[in-house]
Amino acid sequence: SLEAMDDDRTVIVQAKFKEQVPGLTGTFGLPNLSKLNILLNIDEYKENANITVNEQERNGETVPFGLHFENATGDFKNDYRFMSKEVVEEKLKSVKFKGVNWDIEIQPNSASIARFKMQAQANSEETVFVAKTEGTDLKFFFGDSSTHAGNFVFQANVEGALNTGWSWPVAQVLSILSLPGDITMKFSDAGAAMITVDSGMASYDYILPAQSK
């Protein structure tokens, strides 16, 4: 299993690998998740790439400290550095996710995600959006009556209700929804959201505490 958190504490990640990954044992963190996502999707690493776990001796034990990326011909390389166990434990100790009851659970399709991207582009000055239900429609809102604004139906015919109107970070949610895999999205009126991405190799839970606008 794996647990990580963005430096600004907007996203907590909990992952379970379906099979043991060689070299990935112990506790470590994944800083700058957007950089890791970019590296994993670079065309140079799509076929026959060599991605290895770098290890080092620390306090008498061998621990992973990063990933080394190298393309098939060995002329394109990158290194991604893990966060140490001590730093991870310090960062995570105050934000342990205790779990909530989910009021809405959906599996967004590519058309809904594309519409989300269009509204985000049209309202690029907005860093957060509000998720609320109107009847059986789950709607996302950008801006408010005092400025430019927009909204759209993200998913129709949902079960449950969201009435509080919590705000969520646009960039982080869009980044997660762009990841490859089967996606499930959950919202709680208590002020939490979780996006689960099943890549086939692992299942990643991206947990987002609500933000005040």
Go through the PLM ranges and name each one.
Residues 1-79, 99-213:
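DNA polymerase processivity clamps
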Residues 81-92, 96:
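Short, well-ordered, aromatic-rich surface patches in folded extracellular/luminal domains
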